[in-house]
Amino acid sequence: MDIQKVVFVNKQLNTRMAGLLRLPEGFNLSENYPAVVVTGPMLSVKEQAQSVYAERLTAAGFVTLVFDGTYFGESEGMPRQQELPDVKESDIEGAVDFLASLPYVDAERIGGLGICGSGSYMSVAGVKESRLKAITAIVPAIADISKSAMTGFFRPENEVRAAKEAYEQGRGELTYLNFMPRAFDEGAAYYYSSRGTHPRWSNQVVAWSQLELVKYNVVNIMREMTKPYLVITGENAWSREASTEVFDAVPHSNKEMHVIPEASHFDMYDLAPFVSEAFEFIIPFFKKSL
């Protein structure tokens, strides 16, 4: 497989995005290939879990694109480390723009796969972006953040708003939330080990991100989903309840949900036995839907 560094643009924000484009073995420029945009967990960079899934998809014949979101990794955007749902959605739109512009990609056969937080972002993109024809969500973790354990990482709203105002007026420094403390054993086993660590990854997120995250209700949006939809979660995933809520909100019957036995949330990022089992569903789903 051929892996190319690429740059494309989020047209809404006019930010330059850094991506990795994977082309299948035996790639032929004259053919039209199905393609999948693959996005990773909140705060992630393109070399992490999303590349695990992209490699397997490309090995099965799909062109894939992973990228650093605006404000993260090698992509543009200031201040750094802002996790904003509307920006994540516009990043996905920019990725679809890029794939659709490639002469060897069939613009009518572009799908999306998202993991963890972006399992939810990608699901919403499936509602809003008409060029995405099918969506797979791996351990989607966001249903309604205002009711989730994620709020345990948040600070008092008035404190965050005051800090944001002070920064914007030049009177204060950026304040951050820690979204992956080392005390969270399961997450630490991924992010603070060779499995998931990366020099451009940080567990810090600009605190005012919570002001947008807390309003993000994926369940309400998914009631308008019309695309083929696949959800994969783990039997022991802390996100399983949210994944089920998101899946249940989809009103049509062209959807499927599979629970991988014994798998935890972070097991589904990269561990071969669990990811391999997930791909027993992912590849047939995309081959049928794209």
Where do the model's predicted regions map?
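N-terminal cap/lid segment of alpha/beta-hydrolase-fold proteins
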Residues: 1-31
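The serine-hydrolase catalytic nucleophile loop
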Residues: 43-55, 69, 242-243
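Conserved alpha/beta-hydrolase
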Residues: 56-76
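Alpha/beta-hydrolase active-site loop
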Residues: 82-103
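Alpha/beta-hydrolase fold nucleophile elbow
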Residues: 104-116
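Alpha/beta-hydrolase-fold enzymes
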Residues: 123-194
